[in-house]
């Protein structure tokens, strides 16, 4: 049809229609551009409302596990394997854990954002796994942990624990500099997280 269909990978409780940057863009645009901006913003708003509706039906999570699932060859990463071991240990203890490999398994063919949005907003702890600086900064991984850091700024009950292995703690993203990290290469690391 040639029609643009917006997708959202970073939802918010706030409407784009009420965003000061959007309002400024409309103010500075000519009449035609302003009309296009408003029409597209209305479409985005409908998508956002749908995401909020779906996410509102989700049960809250205790913990969100953030990691890179596959490498550049499409093979499973060691991050994913370590994260699954931690997931198994946490769920065995009765925690409700968001782990995309399992949590999103039955959501094939649907947008993942409503479920990620719900989990990020409800989880009190995020465990961000990385065995490589590039994995911590992979697009989807950084999308999740950066959103969580923003939530932490306004909710002091939330905590992010970077979990690293085979890299120097100083090679983690600079945003993690003031966070207590867990070296997953040391004996008993999983038990320490529990």
Model regions: which residues?
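Short glycine-rich, flexible loops that bind phosphorylated cofactors or substrates
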Residues: 134-136
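Hydrophobic/aromatic beta-strand patches that form the interior of the parallel beta-sheet core
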Residues: 127, 161-163, 182
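Active-site regions of enzymes building and remodeling cell-envelope glycoconjugates
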Residues: 10-14, 176-184
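Flexible loop residues that form catalytic
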Residues: 131-132, 168
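Membrane-associated lipid acylation/remodeling enzymes share a hydrophobic transmembrane-juxtamembrane segment
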Residues: 1, 141-165
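Short, glycine/charged-enriched secondary-structure capping and boundary segments
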Residues: 78-79, 113, 141-144, 175-179
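Glycine-rich, charge-decorated loop segments at or immediately adjacent to ligand/cofactor-binding or catalytic sites
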Residues: 2-7, 162, 167-179
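Conserved N-terminal substructure of TIR/SEFIR domains
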Residues: 15, 20-129, 149-159, 187-194
């Amino acid at each position: 049809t040639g029609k643009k269909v917006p997708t959202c990978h970073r939802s918010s409780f706030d409407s784009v229609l009420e965003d000061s940057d959007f309002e400024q863009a409309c103010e500075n645009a000519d009449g035609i551009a302003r009309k296009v901006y408003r029409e597209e913003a209305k479409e985005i708003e409908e998508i956002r409302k749908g995401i909020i509706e779906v996410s509102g039906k989700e049960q809250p999570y205790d913990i969100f596990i953030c990691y890179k699932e596959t490498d550049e060859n499409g093979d499973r990463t060691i991050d994913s394997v370590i994260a699954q071991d931690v997931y198994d240990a946490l769920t065995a203890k009765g925690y409700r854990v968001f782990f995309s490999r399992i949590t999103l398994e039955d959501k094939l063919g649907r947008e993942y954002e409503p479920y990620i949005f719900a989990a990020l907003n409800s989880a009190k702890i995020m465990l961000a796994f990385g065995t490589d600086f590039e994995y911590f900064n992979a697009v989807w991984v950084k999308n999740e942990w950066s959103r969580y850091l923003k939530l932490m700024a306004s909710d002091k009950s939330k905590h992010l624990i970077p979990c690293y292995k085979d890299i120097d703690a100083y090679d983690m993203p600079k945003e993690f500099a003031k966070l207590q990290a867990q070296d997953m290469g040391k004996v008993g690391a999983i038990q320490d997280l529990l």
